Amino acid sequence: INRQKWLKEVLQALPKGIRILDAGACELKNRKYCKHLKYVSQDFCQYQGEKEVGSDSLQLENWDISHIDIVSDITAIPEPDASFDAILCSEVLEHIPEPTHALDEFYRLLKPGGNLILTAPFSSLVHMAPYHYCTGFSKYWYEHHLEARGLSIKTLTANGNWFALMRQEISRLGGIERQRKNWSWPLAYLYGLIGWFYFYMRTDKRAEDLACFGWHCVAVKKE
């Protein structure tokens, strides 16, 4: 299931009026799904979309973080214990040097019975450099680290599978070779097109156990 569609369904299903923290909220992309909630955003507000760190990394321009409620390190958010009914952290864990420390902080901030909503890439190119530290968040990562912290997994579903991931990555080939000024970039586009069609024909096959875009998780803090 598409990540944004999944997030919309999960967030809009939360009870009206509860207090939710959007950790690593960036440009508040998911706030529109939380109009019925008491929404609080947090971000460290240090990434500005600069281009100076490696031209090959994926950078984002026109970065607007002017509407963040709490500016802090995600592992030390200045809020009392058990002060949120739900916490959202979407596509952020790869930008944290020690992502398990963020899980510790989320556990502290959640009320018993509260929901922790997580998404993170299983495989991603370097982006938002230099704040990109890890990838490869498998379902086993969630199962191990959440259960170890007293968080019970409610749902854990894959976004895409290996075939869909390969289709996405091979479609980048022509653009990357052209960016690198490789004389053979037209051939790279052709090769990428052939590969795209092959993997498109295979996307109905289940292969999320090999790889996928990422896992969608809802965990509950044990009472």
Please give the residue ranges for each predicted region:
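A generic short-segment signal for beta-strand/edge and adjacent turn/coil regions
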Residues: W6-Q12, S55-S57, A86, S123-S124, ...
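S-adenosyl-L-methionine-dependent methyltransferase catalytic module, highlighting the catalytic core
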Residues: E61, V71, P97-E105, K111, ...
